[in-house]
């Protein structure tokens, strides 16, 4: 993801948001002959969050050959639905969820969660794109990956910025393997590598990006704390 995640009140600085948008445009320009999917902050200057500040979304973008694929609710980006609000996570402080947007625009979340049609190796594939917590379905009433599969997704991608904790990777493999098996489609989990500071704590991100077959089998996994293609 372009901006990072646990970065505190940097989310409230307009110059930072503008920089994120600038680099997103550069990534879109660079997507010649390849498909790029990345996380970013999206914002709408004509709308406000519930705190009266600029409307921001924890978002993801898919692009190819200089063009952005469609997103949710008429936007050109995917909107995170499941916003964590516990321990170090503070999404509700900064972001507007897909669930809230659907309520605002009188839409149904399960219908808004549609896969993107992306060309990969000259074949049209319906890709279900999720953002981090959207895949941690245990305590949410809406199962985002299953909903995307029900709506036609042939493969699921989870773009994450998930901080390290002891035993977390084992839990990820169990969770995402089960999701792939339940949905009956392959799943790719892509996690951030590096360090971030929210002004109170420093967090490390261990990567360990992984891919799972439709039967839930772990196919491959990247090394911890290593940038990998």
Locate predicted features.
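Enzyme catalytic cores with a strong preference for nitrogen-chemistry domains
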Residues: 1-229
């Amino acid at each position: 993801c372009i901006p990072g995640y646990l970065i505190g009140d940097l989310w409230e600085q307009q110059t930072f948001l503008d920089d994120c948008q600038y680099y997103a445009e550069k990534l879109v320009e660079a997507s010649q002959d390849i498909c790029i999917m990345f996380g970013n902050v999206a914002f709408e200057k004509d709308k406000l969050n519930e705190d009266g500040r600029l409307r921001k979304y924890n978002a993801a973008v898919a692009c190819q050959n200089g063009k952005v694929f469609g997103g949710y609710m008429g936007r050109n980006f995917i909107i995170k639905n499941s916003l964590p609000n516990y321990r170090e996570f503070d999404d509700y402080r900064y972001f507007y969820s897909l669930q809230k947007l659907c309520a605002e625009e009188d839409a149904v979340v399960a219908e808004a969660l549609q896969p993107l049609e992306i060309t990969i190796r000259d074949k049209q594939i319906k890709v279900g794109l999720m953002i981090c917590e959207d895949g941690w379905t245990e305590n949410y009433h809406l199962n985002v990956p299953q909903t995307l599969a029900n709506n036609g997704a042939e493969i699921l991608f989870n773009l994450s910025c998930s901080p390290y904790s002891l035993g977390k990777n084992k839990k990820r493999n169990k969770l995402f393997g089960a999701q792939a098996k339940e949905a009956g489609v392959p799943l790719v989990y892509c996690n951030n590598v590096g360090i971030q500071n929210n002004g109170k704590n420093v967090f490390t991100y261990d990567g360990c990006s992984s891919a799972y077959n439709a039967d839930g089998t772990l196919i491959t996994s990247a090394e911890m704390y290593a940038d990998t293609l």
